[in-house]
Amino acid sequence: MTASAQKNIRNFSIVAHIDHGKSTLADRLIQITGGLTEREMTDQVLDSMDIERERGITIKAQTVRLSYKAKDGETYILNLIDTPGHVDFAYEVNRSLAAVEGSLLVVDASQGVEAQTLANVYQAIDNNHDIVPVLNKVDLPAAEPEKVKAQIEDVIGLDASDAIGISAKTGLNVDQVLEAIVTRLPPPMGDRAAPLKALLVDSWYDTYLGVVVLVRIIDGVLKKGQRIKMMGSGAVNDVDRVGVFTPKMVAMAELGPGEIGFLTGSIKEVADTRVGDTITEDKRPCADMLPGFKPAQPVVFCGLFPVDAAQFEDLRAAMGKLRLNDASFSYEMETSAALGFGFRCGFLGLLHLEIIQERLEREFNLDLIATAPSVIYEIQMTDGSVIDLHNPADMPDVVKIEEIREPWIRATILTPDEYLGSVLKLCQDRRGTQIELTYVGARAMVTYDLPLNEVVFDFYDRLKSISKGYASFDYQITEYRAGDLVKMSILVNSEPVDALSMLVHRARADARGRVMCEKLKDLIPQHLFNIPIQAAIGAKIIARETIKALRKDVTAKCYGGDISRKRKLLDKQKEGKKKMRQFGKVEIPQEAFIAALKMDE
């Protein structure tokens, strides 16, 4: 590839909130530049998983190389990386943005700027991108392009006077977007003669090719037959083939600086290829790694158990397969007295958890129970050591604990001002501290510090329901803070049920315990003896409900007569119940677990 060709490359990504038309715009760009024939076009070409299409979200970063003949007569190569828009995948977004020089900021002309647009745009600005604002859906009757332009200038501080108004659905003005990419975004820098240095953008498992790695070449050349080394994980592999996506896989002889493409080789484990890692040549390595690489850290943990114990091995195999494709998902085996064998899994966030669970159920036909999600707590022991607690059931003895620290987040919430009151109340209820409140037109932007523990449960759902779906929410984990946290156990018939124990803040323990007991009272069927259901902190019972016994009317056969006759029969029944209670076992049905773990307060 000659130097002249390098100046004709443009690498860009599309930044947008969920549902603002990012994937549809990508479809149009592919169609106009002739990347796929009419027959091969499906809606949302780049969202390859069914779940991605159904939920209308992009989970894995995808890439496509388009060739475009511009108005100046030259042919340009455009590399688009389609990034996820959701906060759980913020790290993937960051790495995708690091692989390109510019972004299209797509904003829905009827909705305006949302919280995740903000989060991703700030990441693009941090990566020194040139940004071209694009207003989508201008053909809608509710579109207010001028108002949204003003909003982009107020909230983000970008000059939106030359924003392009388009409709990705009908294809209106999309050709202007292509021209803007060529004229307003810079070509990539890079030295062809330098040692190979490439950014690993993403990787996934392909049944035929093994692990496919998506790379952006910074310096040097990547050819087949080379021996490459991942600097972060230290793995060394031989390259079998290199190529690009147009979105179909097309093999190439080599990839030069500034190009984005894929490589396959003797790589067996996706876990060896970490997003954000630097790839270099084994014999002639580059001097230093690209900045910003950090292995994905799971944030939310929960137990996944098969409803039918016979499916345990299938679940293990399915998790192994998913792990091939998604290295940010981690799991280890665990057993629970109530639920049998299963796995303790770590996720990037709640959406990630839902998606993994849904993929396990859908792609592998498994029935699963998920225990209540929890976060990682740091426990400072009295002997000076610090341990990480993933599962509330494993909490050490209270006497040995100096303090418990929990993760806190900095949340940014954008909401129409009529819902502001309810949003503030929700954050206060969740032990939040308000940091700032600013107005952007008719919308309020609130920044709160909140404990992650309060957010993983159902914060997002509550936020959406109190704001009729208009509020949007984004967060970063900031620090660990000491908190007054206690372990709440649930006892059924005086036996602790491990799957239902949780760490809660002392101030909220009473309410949580009461809700849990009331719930279980309705869910556990009656037995022939009384069943107490208790919530306890240590030895102190904080809430109790009793499931009354089923009993036979033993005095029915006595007509009139002496009271002592009835008394004798009743006492005999009482003795039997007492004995039964001593030896009786309470079976908790699976539905009870599932419902009790869905805490809709």
UniProtKB/Swiss-Prot annotation:
Positions contributing to GTP binding: 19-24, 136-139
Source domain of life: Bacteria
Topology in the lipid bilayer: Peripheral membrane protein
Known EC number: 3.6.5.n1
UniProt-recorded Gene Ontology molecular function terms: GTP binding; GTPase activity; guanosine tetraphosphate binding; ribosome binding; translation elongation factor activity
Lineage per the UniProt record: Bacteria, Pseudomonadati, Pseudomonadota, Alphaproteobacteria, Hyphomicrobiales
Compartments where located: Cell inner membrane
Gene Ontology CC terms, in alphabetical order: plasma membrane
Pfam families found in the cross-reference section: EFG_C, GTP_EFTU, GTP_EFTU_D2, LepA_C
Family note: Belongs to the TRAFAC class translation factor GTPase superfamily. Classic translation factor GTPase family. LepA subfamily.
PROSITE patterns cross-referenced by the UniProt entry: G_TR_1, G_TR_2
Domain (tr-type G) ranges: 7-189
GO BP term, example: positive regulation of translation
Native organism: Xanthobacter autotrophicus (strain ATCC BAA-1158 / Py2)
Keywords: Cell inner membrane, Cell membrane, GTP-binding, Hydrolase, Membrane, Nucleotide-binding, Protein biosynthesis
InterPro entries linked to this entry: EF-4 (IPR006297), EFG_III/V (IPR035647), EFG_V-like (IPR000640), EFTu-like_2 (IPR004161), G_TR_CS (IPR031157), LepA_C_sf (IPR038363), LepA_CTD (IPR013842), LepA_IV (IPR035654)
Protein name (record): Elongation factor 4
